[in-house]
């Protein structure tokens, strides 16, 4: 519509060239076909008036001068003197003059709004740059590219550029120029990895796509993950934007606190930094500041750490920091003032009075004091909020778990926490009395309250059912994998409770597995259970009874440790660092470095909060069992692969399921963020598989275990056994519907489908042979019919059709396959056995020639022997050369390594040719050798003339005994007369095989040739003229002789 309202001067610049139409009579140029037709209505010598067009277009009633003049002035443009038939057309035209035209032509009064239009218009004034179309001379172009585009689109077609070498056509000259690189020997595009060169850049790109090792690797600057393309890197960077991604600061800006998000100081970070040093080195450390994390990952398989690339899904700590709850002011102050390297006893100000009273009266009921502290903690909830990010330290690679709903904590959660605390105190109340002083007990419970409150949320039904059946089937396998892979990467050889070394290395020290109450995991049963508000004391005996009577909880390590003490023979995997006072309750503020340290280094850090008080009470009874001070829901890392520490070797599968099957992590995922798609978690699984693959190189003894694991991931499987979407990464579009094979391009699939359908659309015009690929047809015509062999070998003057075949031929010269008499071997070029076998064969033929030449001294035998052996040798050499030529010609037919049809065709061609050639060489050799030998041996004159050589000839004749008995089976008694030299022509006539039937004649004749060949081998063994070569060729002789003897036995049994 715009083109109708505005002239071309008002339009945006056109990418196509402005077409011009020339008048054949006056050579005047016109911008449109209509202007040219209007011009041709009148003679070119008398230029017509613009009003004549209007006059011609109006009816005759307007022919009077007054009306015509009025009409002319009414419909004439005053700016450009154009005349229009009606007022409406004139008004439309006048719109083009409303804006100022900046660009005016210096050769004509035309002006343009766009500079590009002015430049294109000025080219029309230059008569030297006019390009006319040969087919339609009326069209003139100012740019030769526009003329070529016009010819392709209007006259010739889409593929006007033909290759002079192969006849292939192309749509553009650039395509033809690029194609001509194929016919040259220059290969400028080289792979940087394997140094393979190509004539075209597209072939190099395809090579890199097909070979994963040669792909260009682009490294992510944030996490170090490698990618082959920039597009895949850009997609990855959406999920990996730096260390603050998925954190509160990363999602909502630096320094902005989420509602209810507590700050984490160094002390809190120390308490939750339990990352094993060896494990961190293996999975890669992602150093992030503290803050809430919202990983958008499902419950399985993302509960496995290491599935995600570093910084892709930031892993929360094994044991979380001060839980996402508004803690006591005293707790915040103490954590602020505490240094990670200084051990100071901290006393909570909120409990000063109680602690003083307890210090004065140690006999006060400690459980009541604990209850009082609990109630006071519940009533003191500060509302201040602190910054999300703590100071930078060497422990800043820990991120906190998500899902803290601080403002909407219900009373049932608090009651459940109280209930769990009661259960813990019932089970371990006596242990607290024996273990610590009242002051320590109060401080421990206060810290415990800080962790427990508001940290457990009931998951929804979907999250509870997120773990699939495949998880249950893989629990045992995952436990084995974790034990095998990570057993030596943690604290190796940690002593157990009794001070002895563990039977197998432990992956984590004891504090990695806090004591969990069963009520923490039975979320549906929480609301129906009573909520106790009083904590009743219980005797140690009752506690022990309860512990023995309870079924072992998969997360309650307290009962586990109690059981371990009762039965020390059971292997323990708790692996707690022991010392002279290892029974002291562990403080979970210990960092990973101190946990990986020795026993002496661990002791002061382990109880740095209570160490002074402990020194003040040296007479406290010590027990070997205790419970950890923080009961909380299943953390992010409490999954089967890390819970192998509790595994017994003989546990049945159902018990393992109860132990290692992680409940649905309801608190892990924030409700505001959706679950990831399949591509995200498949990428995570792939990352885990790659890490396990690389880790296996350090532990090769794990191969047998992993290969037998029936895991759903099949970690140790080959690359072909992995899912295709992990290997192809988006190239599943071109899949064969017959065999399921996947191709990176549609052209490859089309070519492959012809192998199933048998379609061969390309037919040779000379021999009517059909091909499924056009390149095979071109190669066939070039090599077979045209005999084009421009590439010549400078060593043997052989010619080849392509440079690649010449290069292959030159390599044979370098390896020595074509040097000396190596071509004399009937198998040298066909089987490609190498130069060593050629030397053996060459020595074998030399021995036969030398033996015959030295053993034959009469007038006939030297001539016959030389002619026989040399003749057969020449024929063998000729056959070997022909096989070499044929092999090279066939090699020329194998140019494209991706050409499936040509590979199959060459295999089919090579096999019959090889067998036929071997048979032909054997037949020629046996005919030349066998016939002449028999004829020369049975000649009576030979034995009558010379008696000196009787001994040698007798041996020679004995070697023919098997042949003679087969060839002349009915006259075997007469054959023995050869020893006495009594032969005549009548007896010789009886030696013919005319009396044999045709069924026996052919197989016996063929077997006789094999026996003659075996005879020559035996002769070469009897008199070796080259000791150096005889030893090297002994194996070759034995093999050939054994084959000949087996055929002789077979032929005798057949007769």
Swiss-Prot record:
Sequence motif Nuclear localization signal, location on chain: 422-435
Zn finger limits (C2H2-type): 21-48, 75-97, 103-125, 131-155, 161-183, 189-211, 218-240, 734-756, 762-785, 791-813
Positions in coiled-coil regions: none
Disordered: annotated span: 324-345, 372-423, 531-621, 813-837, 922-957
BP terms from Gene Ontology: negative regulation of DNA-templated transcription; negative regulation of transcription by RNA polymerase II; pronephric distal tubule morphogenesis; pronephric duct development; pronephros development; proximal/distal pattern formation involved in pronephric nephron development; regulation of transcription by RNA polymerase II
Keyword Repressor: yes
Location of the motif CTBP-binding motif 1: 554-558
Tissue and organ distribution: Expressed dynamically during embryonic development; in the developing pronephros, specific areas of the brain (forebrain, midbrain and hindbrain), and in the majority of the visceral arch, and head mesenchyme derived from neural crest cells. Within the pronephros, expressed in the ventroposterior region of the pronephros anlagen from stage 20 (and is absent from the splanchnic layer that forms the glomus), then expression becomes restricted to the distal tubule and duct by the tadpole stage. In adults, expressed in various tissues including kidney, lung, testis, spleen and stomach.
Biased composition (Polar residues): 332-345, 399-413, 569-583, 591-601, 816-827
Chain location of the short sequence motif CTBP-binding motif 2 per the record: 585-589
Any one cellular-component term (Gene Ontology): nuclear speck
UniProt xrefs under Pfam families: zf-C2H2, zf-C2H2_6
Induction: By retinoic acid (RA) signaling. Repressed by wt1 and by notch signaling.
PROSITE patterns on file: ZINC_FINGER_C2H2_1 (PS00028), ZINC_FINGER_C2H2_2 (PS50157)
Keyword Transmembrane annotated: no
Complex and partners: Homooligomer. Interacts with ctbp.
Protein name, entry field: MDS1 and EVI1 complex locus protein EVI1-A
Record organism: Xenopus laevis (African clawed frog)
Upper lineage: Eukaryota, Metazoa, Chordata, Craniata, Vertebrata
